[in-house]
């Protein structure tokens, strides 16, 4: 938002030219995320405690885990809020890769949210197998977009650059999708 608001004015006010630099926007995005987490963190913890949204510790678990009983869960909400807030404020929202990152983070956050909700309702979250499958699906969606729908895709899109080996760049072809799913 700040990029779209202030950068067009840089022709009249030269000090606003800093908004074109990704390093400037990245630094202030990080500062914004930190400030938001400090401002909202205690409030969110109090709200989660008020609504009794906390960890339930099994009786057959280790004794030192008993002290964690009632610890607020769903901390990912704070992370997602600060991430989305700082991204929407500082990023160039016309960049399709920003939206791809927002999709990935939101997708993984939805998986975590589902896991936390099931932990609260049933005492156990989603299985490791289901979580892995859902994460792979989000990763594959990103990979499919990058491989088949990205207008900026080049002939090097499926090549793997190996550090220190300038000439060695194997073309992964369709295996690129599995590589992306593994990396993400």
Language-model-derived ranges and their functions:
Residues 2-184:
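"…together with the soluble PPM/PP2C metallo-phosphatase catalytic core" -> "…together
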